[in-house]
């Protein structure tokens, strides 16, 4: 994947403002609420019976932070995303059996969360760069499935 200097700047500039704990928790909670079938991968998280329960669930919050922290590794390694996510791809494919479509769904939700939190900074050019990034990350995570 080729990144222009402008794309890199738009991605890293916005990433520097992201509260990983809050945005990660919100993104994962939205995934579980909007796409309830994804909850089956989180049965050990306890009460996911309603949006209120999901939003208040400390395990959702903690895992959301973990997910977005990993996403930060992509931002730091834009030129080597495939290798950055090789182990996570293996884990999600071989051990967790996560449908790779869920990576795309989470990427789309992350775009929504970023747009909501950073409306002024989230210009169409910024969105295009981030859309490219979430697509590349989703592809890297799905790599072991092929």
UniProtKB/Swiss-Prot annotation:
InterPro entries: Globin, Globin-like_sf, Globin/Proto, Hemoglobin_b, Hemoglobin_oxygen_transport. The lineage of its organism: Eukaryota, Metazoa, Chordata, Craniata, Vertebrata. Heme b binds at residues 63, 92. One of its GO terms (molecular function) is peroxidase activity. GO terms for biological process: hydrogen peroxide catabolic process. GO terms for cellular component: blood microparticle; haptoglobin-hemoglobin complex; hemoglobin complex. Gene3D superfamilies: Globins (1.10.490.10). Red blood cells. Keywords: Heme, Iron, Metal-binding, Oxygen transport, Transport. This is Hemoglobin subunit beta. Heterotetramer of two alpha chains and two beta chains. Belongs to the globin family. The gene is HBB. PANTHER family: HEMOGLOBIN FAMILY MEMBER, HEMOGLOBIN SUBUNIT EPSILON. It comes from the Eukaryota. Residues 2-146 form the Globin domain. The keyword Metal-binding applies. Involved in oxygen transport from the lung to the various peripheral tissues.
